[in-house]
Amino acid sequence: MIPDIALVYANTPTFNGIKTYSKNLYVGLKQEGMDARLYAKKQIELRINGKKYFGWASSEVLSHIYQYHGKRITHATADWEINKHTNVLTIHDLTQYHEWLRGLTSLSPHIQKHFSWLFQRISDIKIITPSRHVEDQIRYVLPDADISVITIEVNPPLLRTETNWENPYPDDGKLHLVTMGEIYNKRKRIRDLYEFVKDRKDVTLHHIGMMTDEFRAYSPNIIPLGQVDELTKLSHLKFADKFIFYTKDEGQGIPTMEAMRCNTQVIVNDIPIHRELLGDRPYYFHDKEEFLDLLYKPKKTGLVEQISQYDNWIEKHIQAYNEVKE
């Protein structure tokens, strides 16, 4: 039976924010009594020396083969999942495309073709985006696009249940920092972060995310945790002295918001998306010296409250669906 709302996403083998968004959106819609179904489309990945190939490109191919659709709404939760039935699309960011326009990066012919096709296809469908920052990126290309800005709720189920939390960090008098992201992801500036903290005797950096062999023994005070389960991830966020996120750009930045939901102080680099969604609750840095000074600052108040303001996201998605043109 065809559902009223079809959510189509790529079932990637590793953690990513789009996967979390898709699953949480589905659960939220069902809790509101909506006739929704989640279609998990397998993503094909090949790894060579820890680096990922194909990935999202394989999603685009499979989207044309498996034409999932709903009676009223077919919502592709990322632009690689769009097909001929799609009438709602979530665009998480267009950073890569805008860097290419400014000559700051190169795009393969396949990626250029993807963006060209995408902008032709989405000119007359409902677009959902998590921030005004991304809305501006889209309007630069499509000034008259039908856009709803809906910041994703970040409230992991484990934080809402009785959980026997255990502190994963040793009581050794050091500052225990944690960060998240894939080491080979060019957008995440984890390698720079490694340089900031390496060999510091009073600081330990714990890194959650995919790792390559060359970085496993980078410094004695950097602990590569690799991929971890949800409980392990949240335990590290919850008990850390600081959560660190250093990135070129984001559509929303879910890991940082997860840390703030855990009432953990975050330190982030000063970019527009952080200012828009996180307000003045983080500590912002611009260089290594400023970053190191911030490690010893006290925790601010209002961290959880800053993130909980986005908890009405399901209501806003339903409103956006009701605005879709027949």
Predicted segments, located by residue:
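Carbohydrate transferase catalytic cores enriched for Leloir-type hexosyltransferases
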Residues: 1-326
